[in-house]
Amino acid sequence: AAAAGGAIGVLTDALPRDGEGEGSGFGVCGPDVIVVRDSLVALQRLASWNRQQSAALCVGVTGSVGKTTTRQMIHAVLGEQWSVLQSPANYNNEIGVPLTLLELGPAHGAAVLELGAGRVGDIRFLCGLAHPEWGVITRVSACHLESFGDLSAVQATKQELVEAIPGSGCVFLNADQAEVCAMSRATSARVVYFGYQAEGSGRCALRGVEGGRIRFCS
């Protein structure tokens, strides 16, 4: 399928057995084939290497809700100054984040990545690939409790992004939720609060809807 779709290379941990590859495009004139022990691990390592070749600012966005909208807004703002890569759709897991990072090139000045989680440790792992310098926490809520167990586990998992931000970086926290505000104790980076309760920081209020556009005032 990859060859038929025009792929010039294939990364795989399983070559087709004799007869199974007939008509697949593999062969002397087909795509280059790289065989590895684990194709997912290889994908992640390639993505991490590509990220380390880039000087682009990396912004990680996580939270139980609002990741996509927040990512799109950050992309729009940073796009005023740089060429910005962003996660396509909801590419926010152990496959989607590496695929996004592989798109990072010399022309990009920044990257905005959604970081999702299905269990404790997922965000920490993704940060190990992406090395974000800025982190944004939207909100913590009782989502996916079938895998997390309780709200404290969700909070701890989202906090993994805060813990990954270097001291020279910046963390943006939702001032309207105590569970998110408490994450400030987990970082030595600069902390910027946003929300209705964010006095002296990033406070904004809905001004209204005009012609299909939402207007805010800060």
Residue ranges and their predicted role:
Residues 37, 88, 194-197:
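Residues at the C-termini of beta-strands that transition into short coil/loop
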Residues 3, 12, 16-30, 136-218:
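Acidic, Mg2+-coordinating active-site environments of NTP-dependent enzymes
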Residues 34, 85, 192:
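General small-molecule cofactor/ligand-binding pocket signal
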Residues 31-41:
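N-terminal pre-Walker A segment at the start of P-loop NTPase domains
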